[in-house]
Amino acid sequence: MFTLKKSLLLLFFLGTINLSLCEQERNAEEERRDEPDERNAEVEKRFFPIVGKLLSGLSGLLGK
């Protein structure tokens, strides 16, 4: 029983460290993304697929 508790405690400890490292990495990425160039690239990535779908839908309607 004692070995089971030790191994569970070790897994919990390692999982906590892993989550902490992931959170730090995510925060660093968010800080880098706050730069204006990155925000513009993000908007372009979201904007162009929507425009493409609209244009293809309109061309399909006009082609009929």
From Swiss-Prot:
Keyword annotations of the record: Amidation, Amphibian defense peptide, Antibiotic, Antimicrobial, Cleavage on pair of basic residues, Fungicide, Immunity, Innate immunity, Secreted, Signal
Keyword hit for Lipid metabolism: no
Tissue expression profile of the protein: Expressed by the skin glands.
Pfam families: FSAP_sig_propep (PF03032)
Subcellular location: Secreted
Modified sites of kind Leucine amide: L62
Signal peptide: 1-22
InterPro entries cross-referenced by the UniProt entry: Frog_antimicrobial_propeptide
One GO location term (cellular component): extracellular region
Family, as annotated: Belongs to the frog skin active peptide (FSAP) family. Temporin subfamily.
Protein name: Temporin-ALf
Species for this entry: Amolops loloensis (Lolokou Sucker Frog)
UniProt lineage: Eukaryota, Metazoa, Chordata, Craniata, Vertebrata
